[in-house]
Amino acid sequence: MCGIFGTTRRYERSVVEHKLELMNFRGPDHTGVEEIQTPDGEKLTFGHVRLSIIDLDPRSNQPFVYNDDISIVFNGEVYNYLELKKQYLGDVALRTESDTEVICAMYEKLGVDSVKLFNGMFAYVIYDRRKNIMVGARDRLGKKPFYFWHEGKDLEFASQPKVIKYGNNLHVDATARQFYLLQGIIPDPYSPFAEVKKLRAGECFTFNLSSGKLDIQTYWDVDTNSCGFTAPKSYDEAKLMVKDLLFDAVRLRLNANVPVGTFLSGGIDSSLICAIVSKFNKDLCAYTAGFDNQQFDESHFAVDVARSLGVPIKVCPCTGDDLMKVFNDYITYFDEPFADDSLIPSSLVAEKARQDVTVILGGDGGDELFYGYPKYEWTKARLHQYQKSYWLRKLFTPYFKHKGGEEEVMQSTQHDYADVYRSLGMFCYDMGGAEKFDRITLGKQQPDMKYLHNKQRGILAYSDYDMKTFMNAVNQKVDRATMRCSMELRSPIMDYRVAEYSRLLPYEYMINGELGLKRILKDILYEMVPRELLDRPKRGFVPPTKDWFRGEMKQDLFDTVSHDNLTNLLPELDADKFIALRDAFVNGKDISSRIFFTAYTYICLLYTSPSPRDYAA
């Protein structure tokens, strides 16, 4: 787990060093820079900050040079690198024990397509001197971030957007802002800045340094036709396969040359991962948060689960002052707007656990892949009602008097799933509480709306959509929350094989009347943990953002979310009505603080944060 940077622009060495310093928390163990002279006399610079996990020897520091012709910067882990060495590289002499060198050797043997064999979370770029090209890729589910700026014959990339921003005059992207107001995140391929894009999950690229041509390709998608599995013939067959895949995913993710632990909230997903980990090693410690607000403290549930598994557990005390400190650090570490304040306690728990371990396993991805959100149940019922009206429309279409009536009706049915999703308020990321934003420009179609239009997928289309969009939010949160304290989080449920197989499972395997949401995961877990320890409503911890905005941060809220700032910086919103909403909230009206957190963080990060040169101070 690291931070990567590269550019064809001619910066002074001090500028490159400052850029790397902006993300040194991602990799405090080593900082490296390589200045490369290309065959046509141009300059290419690679930079890397390393968090040492595999092969701690300095020989594996980056930028890494392989056989003189290949240089690489790499963030993440290729979990199956030992299997790849055995299967493909038996005749290759390697000088390290790192997965970094395996990526290089696999590229030399198989080319760009070698990425299709990697099981992991990664973002990497290779420079091939022989061809004078850069090739790069991002993992299938987008666990690791990758930002880039392509202009003319220049390409610059980094793990975080502020690294590209430093020393450059970038402009805010209005389309990204509109998506942020709707979703609470900036979806791929957008970034806060118009010039900067994200490589999307499952994409790879080739950049020709001589011509400046950038060719981006998709090497993996959620399309079930491309996966290596067949649909199960029974529920028992499906459960056994999911269990086997999860066990193997955990096995791969336990490999490290540094201390490893597990997050354990006491919920279904984290308990499942902790239970599987205990089958491999009962000595690995579990970590949970103990909040001083008893209304939200669930540490006793986690302790009960750990005791039933016979694993050690450490309750990390988290106070209101601790949370406030993390919030004050927001601008430094979370350099892209993110409207979910749960990232604050997530960051704090990671910080506490980092005192003992460098790598930690978590249960992220279970809700998106195995129907863990109540909206799936709501949407199923609503869709059934909606589709009944569709057949009525189709029946009466021949009797429409106006020209084009049939085409109009049939066109409308192509958007059934999107319409139902929108009617349930899923596009407007809880932007209201007791009130609603009065004006949000929907503008352009969302990038991944095509997944909702897939009629053959039925209700599963919603899960496909969440996997391509809201999983971005999960990935961004855990990446920033853990890298803030130089910790690597691994998510076995997000193994691409688990994701592929989950796409083949019918709705009733995911949700049923008795077990409710995430049926198949619960069935697997109940084989290892008593059901009575787990059957309870899911609450989650809500940081006291509302109290902060009404108390010690009240003036800061007024100064930041001001009428002028709303008018000039968030023009999609009605400034008069929003200010009235803000004042009513501060005076005690029951309104969701998330509305103001959304606006506050956007303005802070993009307009009131330090200038690029101040970042390096």
Language model region names:
Residues 1, 113, 166, 195-201, ...:
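Adenosyl-5′-phosphate
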Residues 1-334, 346, 350, 527, ...:
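Cysteine-centered catalytic environments shared across enzyme families
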Residues 64, 154, 376-380, 617:
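Glycine-rich, phosphate-binding/catalytic loops in enzymes
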Residues 370-394:
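A mobile, often basic/glycine-rich helix-loop segment
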